[in-house]
Design a protein with these regions (language model features):
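Nucleotidyl polymerases of mobile genetic elements and RNA viruses
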Residues: 1-178
């Protein structure tokens, strides 16, 4: 699954950390000063991102991203029939079904969420977007660390355009921006 993710996604990937993304932001700022370009940043986060990934949408996304059917089937079996109860001071509730969210503590969950996030970014068209900052022949308009996304562009209008595209695609798969 690691091959499916671009360099701009550092979340839960071997050899990549938040510190690296901070260094990238610092590099972008330095290059924008060097080339005398305006630079704008917008940092976004999702409300309960890992809890809101819909299972049925997740299976569809995995299929569309070319994840082999046998792997998706295994994942579906892991998530099938999940239930929970809540214990309070007055007793325990009846069991209820869980139809969204990735399994807390599972080593697969970050990978699944990264693919979910990649689907959103791809459908928002950020890979092809002209918005961003062009440094050394490369257009950079976002950096990601799991569910946290940073947009960068040369104008407020470009930032708003990127934000609105991602907001729209996120809502289609059940995620809301904070």
């Amino acid at each position: 699954m690691n091959d499916e993710l671009p360099d701009v996604q550092a979340g839960f990937r071997q050899g990549r950390r938040t510190r690296g993304q901070i260094a990238n932001i610092s590099w972008i700022i330095g290059k924008s000063k060097e080339f005398q370009k305006n630079i704008y940043f917008c940092f976004i986060d999702y409300t309960k991102a890992f809890d809101c990934a819909h299972h049925t949408k997740m299976w569809k996304i995995l299929k569309e991203m070319g994840i082999p059917d046998h792997l998706t089937c295994l994942l579906r079996n892991v998530y099938a029939g999940q239930g929970a109860t809540v214990r309070t001071g007055h007793g325990t509730t009846d069991q209820f079904q869980i139809g969204k969210g990735v399994c807390q503590g599972s080593i697969l969950s970050p990978c699944l969420f990264n693919l979910y996030s990649e689907y959103i970014i791809g459908n928002a068209g950020l890979d092809e977007a002209q918005a961003g900052i062009n440094i050394a022949g490369r257009n950079i308009n976002n950096l990601r660390c799991a569910e946290d996304i940073m947009f960068t562009a040369e104008s407020e209008e470009e930032i708003m355009s990127l934000l609105m595209k991602v907001k729209k695609e996120s809502e289609k798969v059940g995620l809301k921006l904070i």
